[in-house]
Amino acid sequence: MRHKYEMQLRKLHAEMIEMGTMIEQAIETAIKALVAQDTELAKKAIEADDAIDHQEREIENLCLKLFLTQQPVAGDMRNISAALKMITDMERIGDHASDISELTLCMAGTPYIKKLEHIQQMAKETIVMLVSSIEAYVNADEKKAKSVIEHDDVVDDLFDKVKNELITMIHENPDDGEQACDLLMVAKYLERIGDHATNISEWVHFSITGEHVD
């Protein structure tokens, strides 16, 4: 019985890794489409969100099956409960990647008013946070989970840079206001992705220690 249970837990971890990979690719595709102003790629990124939603439902079903059929002990129950919480944040990350691509479509055909280097850096940092949070969950690595939580400040600082740059540009040239607002929303979605990655790591911390992060 325990062997079967451990096999199902390994399957859960594999499905979590798969969902994490899907979301990582979604962010990368959304940013690639944004930078290149590639509308076809942006549309593909939006369509990919359905697969992420499906993966969330698959993991939900697996977690509920584990609860109902295996009677998990306290530590395993925290692990499964954390997975259910984590996939909610993961699904929201997928939504935000899709939102970025929607904005790419809105800005298509118009040259950017600024370089996107800080936005690209934000995306890289959020991907690092996401991948590390999933690794922390699968490997029960409390130290790595804490490092992700601390890393959120890096993303927040980059967001502040983008925001301040865009506000200055609006003041200097109000005609750039519409695109500046769209780019600010892109940065805001990336900042939220960082927040969701932080939430994931906080649930990882709970699954390992049984304690919530202050």
Label each PLM-derived region with a short phrase.
Residues 1-214:
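Cytosolic, long alpha-helical scaffolding segments
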